[in-house]
Regions:
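Conformational coupling and interaction surfaces
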Residues: 20-21, 41-49, 53, 173-176, ...
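Metal-dependent C-N hydrolase catalytic cores
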Residues: 24, 65-116, 121, 271-277, ...
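Sec-dependent N-terminal signal peptides
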Residues: 6-8
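N-terminal signal peptide c-region/cleavage motif recognized by signal peptidases
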Residues: 14-16
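Hydrophobic, well-ordered secondary-structure segments
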Residues: 11-12, 126
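Positively charged n-region of N-terminal signal peptides that target proteins for export
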Residues: 1-4
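Active-site histidine-anchored catalytic micro-motif
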Residues: 20-56, 60-71, 84-87, 98-200, ...
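A broad structural signal for alpha-helix termini and local helix breaks/kinks
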Residues: 80-81, 138, 255
């Protein structure tokens, strides 16, 4: 309770800005070998973006277990959150698995406290269990969420395959891990923008990009150092031209939307639990906005933002003892 009170007090002090108010839900796993790093790229991009004001972060399972994602989120905020006026008191643990759907958590309590005071855009970088739980617990507050931006959705029959022979396949992870939660959010009729994995797979960083980030110091150096094994996996095992930072693209609708191709589409849950997106209205579908592509400038924009110099008081980029 004390932590929640401190969090609300910090929030009230920050309410004077004109930046868009967002809540970010993340399964960040940077710092562990062979884990995805794209959530961390997305979070640092958000920290460095004056167009948005982050009112809180919730953690969820997905890329790693909840305890690990919560530690990673707090570590990242402690290092680089100062630029966004964030402290570890802004990070709340949520669902540990799909079986936690509907179960109250620190994340659901904190989001409720926020929405009692103001509306937010909810950016979901992981499975939708936390948001669906909130909607089940507080259905009358759904209209307090102005929009959901979600990394998920796919065209029917499309396989997410990578590499020169298209032999490395992945599923639509955030949907796959809790399709029931995805269905709950879809039925809520909150305005929904989808940033599909298939689209984000084209936003690649390579060795030259990591060296550029390393030279910039601060958060860029940290991301570069912690992404080396991840990049090796994508370039040597999957044999792509770089590593995809899927989740970073989900921040761009709030910062540089003109860089994106966003089209009106229709989404529904199919019998297999997939979030299917089509250009034509089908039975049981609802309208969504779908990110189908992005301008070449998008990668340059992301890299520039990641390289912003840390403000006075930010933690050093060298890895802390784990």
């Amino acid at each position: 309770m004390r932590k929640l009170c401190v969090f609300i007090a910090i929030l009230c002090l920050a309410c004077g800005t004109h930046a868009a108010t967002v809540w970010i839900d993340t399964d960040v796993s940077i710092g562990s070998p062979f884990r995805e790093v794209d959530d961390a790229f997305a979070l640092v991009l958000a920290f460095h973006s004056p167009e948005i004001r982050i009112t809180g972060l919730s953690t969820t399972y997905g890329n790693a277990p909840l305890g690990q994602t919560t530690r990673a989120a707090r570590d990242l905020v402690q290092r680089f959150g100062r630029s966004a006026d964030l402290t570890v008191d802004h990070v709340f643990a949520g669902a540990g698995s799909a079986s936690d759907l509907g179960r109250r958590s620190g994340a659901s309590d904190a989001l409720t406290a926020i929405l009692q005071k103001q509306k937010v855009t909810y950016i979901a970088l992981g499975p939708l269990t936390n948001l669906a739980t909130f909607l089940q617990l507080h259905p009358k507050m759904a209209n307090r969420i102005e929009r959901v931006i979600f990394v998920g959705g796919q065209a029917p029959g499309v396989s997410l395959a990578f590499g020169p022979t298209r032999s490395f396949h992945i599923h639509d992870a955030n949907v796959f891990k809790d399709s029931a939660a995805t269905g709950t959010v879809l039925r809520s009729n909150i305005p929904l923008t989808l940033v599909p994995t298939a689209t984000g797979s084209h936003l690649l960083v390579d060795g030259a990009d990591l060296r550029q980030l390393e030279r910039s110091g601060g958060a860029g150096n940290y991301l570069s150092h912690e992404s080396r094994i991840w990049l090796w996996f994508w370039t040597h095992f999957v044999k792509t031209n770089g590593g995809p930072i899927f989740d970073a693209l989900a921040i761009v609708p709030m910062t540089r939307p003109e860089l994106l191709s966003i089209k009106k589409r229709y989404a529904r849950m199919d019998e297999a639990g997939n979030l299917v997106v089509t250009p034509r209205l089908t039975n049981g579908a609802r309208t969504v906005r779908d990110c189908t592509g992005f301008a070449l400038e998008t990668k340059r924009f992301v890299l520039r933002r990641l390289q912003q110099a840390p403000r006075k008081g930010e933690a050093p980029a060298e890895p802390l003892g784990r």
